[in-house]
Amino acid sequence: MDIVVGKQDFLYLGAAIIRFMAMNTGFTPQFSLDELYISPFSAERYFDSVTGQALYRPVERNMSPTGIHLMDRFLQIVCLSEHYTVNTLRNKLGVEMREFSVFCLLLTGMEYESLHEAIRLRLADDLLRFTDMEMRDVARRCGYSDYSGLFKLFERKYKRSVGDRQRQLRKRGDVGRWRI
């Protein structure tokens, strides 16, 4: 009897081997979340030394933090796009999410879902702290179709509401410090 292994079986087996190696061999990820994160802010506030007027100057953003097209495109979509879905990601990246998850694991030590969630949390924290965006707009910017998804994520991760998290993060002078 011949054993036939299809593409999906091969991918599943490969993913299992990679997961095992990543969890059990002292695997060191190539990139940290801080290295991958693309800030949503394009300008930084400063005060004119003569007039004291608040002005903005452009900030440089590394739009290709990994130099790997597939990962950089994912980061650009997740960090800089308005609302998107898993289908949008799959179509724009041209890869199945299971395959992409293994790719993420190799580069970051996190599978797609964990990486995506970590980026969403970081993005939401930045938007809540430095902008006066409505909560629903923050949620959309983080890839949720409505506020409830962001609320549930914050309740699960921080054990607090989005508004409570905003009050915890925000310091005097933060709003307007950066511009999208």
What are these regions (language model features)?
Residues 102-103, 114, 126, 149-153, ...:
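DNA-binding alpha-helical recognition surfaces that contact promoter or target DNA
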Residues 88-93, 138-139:
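Short alpha-helical "recognition helix" segments of helix-turn-helix
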Residues 106-142, 168-180:
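Terminal helix-turn-helix DNA-binding modules in bacterial transcription factors
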Residues 132-168:
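Sequence-specific DNA-binding recognition helix
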Residues 1-57:
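DNA-contacting interfaces and partner/effector-binding or oligomerization modules
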Residues 51-85, 104, 108, 125-134, ...:
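Basic, amphipathic alpha-helical hairpins
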Residues 92, 96-98, 145-146:
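Short coil turns linking two alpha-helices in DNA-binding domains
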Residues 65-72, 115-122, 147:
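Short alpha-helical elements of helix-turn-helix
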